[in-house]
């Protein structure tokens, strides 16, 4: 089982590396207008036109490798892979939502893609189906908090929807500079691979390692200067995948710390908007806490200082800083669980 899982990761890595140049070349040959830039970070303007929707490639590779390996293992006497298929299902559902959003922006020239309400409705439907086909049959209606069950009853459905939709959008916000989201998710997935291994949930481990391999292959083309971006098709799917894995492993709360980067990025946006509206109402003029949100843009424009102007950070500096925070959060969780 473990050997097959490792092989799956290696195959995903190789296939993604081999397939991505054809995807990029397709963009160039068809003269498709890629990523649009409407940001105040001037150094990002040079990225306009970079091929996007690269998540289509690594999602399909990871899904194909996972499905084939799960099928082969099952017919050769291995366990059932219900959890694998459930997680794969929500990955593809959210990937499809992201694909539709990207497609409308890039090919139909609809700047906003799906409206916020359309996207939210589709995400909620995807989360609800995941609950009905995977969570509800298990009879679970409680959160596992340090080994103690917190029974939520009917509110557990609301939690599932909030968790999946919330982290899907959180990873989407994180995907704002070259390589940040891809390696942040790799760190999170590797942490959950340890938890899955300890729990002997090799069905979950299989899809985790397959996706890690595909993401590392994608990073070869996504690190600065990026030759391709993952797009909403990739980021929405990855966020939903992390939420689904945490639910399946009964370690939901750990995602708040393992995914501290996504939480920080989302919190910065919420704080910025709330504070701006509050100060505008109180003082007649909106004020900001951060130079720009999500948080990675704040770092780019002047480092950690809030209102004072500091030295601008390069994308690599921002990447390594936030990757380090994600790694520390992951190590903290493993220490809490197993030391």
UniProtKB/Swiss-Prot annotation:
PROSITE patterns from the UniProt entry: MRAY_2
A cellular component term, taken from the record's GO annotations: plasma membrane
Molecular function (Gene Ontology), one example: metal ion binding
Pfam families: Glycos_transf_4 (PF00953), MraY_sig1 (PF10555)
Main EC class the enzyme belongs to: transferase
Enzyme Commission number, as recorded: 2.7.8.13
InterPro entries, per database record: Glycosyl_transferase_4, PNAcMuramoyl-5peptid_Trfase, PNAcMuramoyl-5peptid_Trfase_CS
Pathway info: Cell wall biogenesis; peptidoglycan biosynthesis
Subcellular location, record wording: Cell membrane
Cofactor entry: Mg(2+)
Catalytic activity: UDP-N-acetyl-alpha-D-muramoyl-L-alanyl-gamma-D-glutamyl-L-lysyl-D-alanyl-D-alanine + di-trans,octa-cis-undecaprenyl phosphate = Mur2Ac(oyl-L-Ala-gamma-D-Glu-L-Lys-D-Ala-D-Ala)-di-trans,octa-cis-undecaprenyl diphosphate + UMP
Biological processes per GO annotation: cell division; cell wall organization; peptidoglycan biosynthetic process; regulation of cell shape
Membrane topology: Multi-pass membrane protein
Main location: membrane
Keyword entries, A-Z: Cell cycle, Cell division, Cell membrane, Cell shape, Cell wall biogenesis/degradation, Magnesium, Membrane, Metal-binding, Peptidoglycan synthesis, Transferase, Transmembrane, Transmembrane helix
Transmembrane segments annotated in the record for this chain: 4-24, 53-73, 80-100, 113-133, 145-165, 176-196, 202-222, 228-248, 253-273, 318-338
Protein's UniProt keywords contain Membrane: yes
Coiled-coil regions listed in the entry: none
Described function: Catalyzes the initial step of the lipid cycle reactions in the biosynthesis of the cell wall peptidoglycan: transfers peptidoglycan precursor phospho-MurNAc-pentapeptide from UDP-MurNAc-pentapeptide onto the lipid carrier undecaprenyl phosphate, yielding undecaprenyl-pyrophosphoryl-MurNAc-pentapeptide, known as lipid I.
Family that this chain belongs to: Belongs to the glycosyltransferase 4 family. MraY subfamily.
Name this protein carries in UniProt: Phospho-N-acetylmuramoyl-pentapeptide-transferase
Organism: Streptococcus mutans serotype c (strain ATCC 700610 / UA159)
């Amino acid at each position: 089982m473990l050997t097959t899982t490792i092989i799956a990761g290696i195959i995903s890595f190789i296939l993604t590396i081999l397939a991505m140049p054809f995807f990029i070349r397709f963009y160039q040959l068809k003269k498709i207008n890629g990523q649009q830039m409407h940001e105040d970070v001037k150094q990002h303007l040079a990225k306009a036109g970079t091929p996007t929707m690269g998540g289509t490639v690594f999602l399909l590779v990871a899904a194909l490798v996972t499905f084939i390996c799960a099928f082969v293992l099952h017919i050769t006497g291995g366990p059932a892979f219900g959890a694998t298929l459930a997680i794969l299902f929500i990955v593809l559902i959210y990937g499809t939502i992201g694909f539709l959003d990207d497609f409308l922006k890039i090919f139909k020239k609809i700047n906003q893609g799906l409206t916020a309400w359309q996207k939210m409705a589709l995400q909620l439907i995807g989360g609800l189906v995941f609950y009905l086909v995977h969570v509800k049959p298990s009879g679970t209606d409680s959160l596992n908090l340090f080994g103690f069950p917190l029974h939520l009853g009917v509110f557990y459905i609301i939690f599932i929807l909030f968790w999946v939709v919330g982290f899907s959008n959180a990873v989407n916000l994180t995907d704002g500079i070259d390589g940040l989201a891809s390696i942040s998710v790799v760190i999170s997935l590797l942490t959950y691979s340890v938890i899955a291994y300890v729990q002997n949930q090799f069905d979950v481990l299989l899809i985790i390692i397959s996706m890690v391999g595909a993401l590392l292959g994608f990073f070869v083309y996504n690190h600065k200067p990026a030759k391709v971006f993952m797009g909403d098709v990739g980021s929405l799917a990855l966020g939903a995948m992390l939420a689904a894995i945490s639910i399946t492993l009964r370690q939901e709360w750990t995602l708040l710390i393992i995914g501290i980067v996504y939480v920080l990025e989302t919190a910065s946006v919420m704080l910025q908007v709330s504070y701006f509206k509050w100060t505008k109402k109180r003082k007649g003029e909106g004020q900001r806490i951060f130079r720009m949100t999500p948080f990675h843009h704040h770092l780019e424009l002047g480092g950690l200082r809030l209102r004072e102007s500091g030295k601008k950070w390069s994308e690599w500096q921002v990447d390594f800083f936030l990757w380090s925070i994600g790694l520390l959060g992951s190590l903290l969780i493993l220490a809490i669980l197993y030391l």
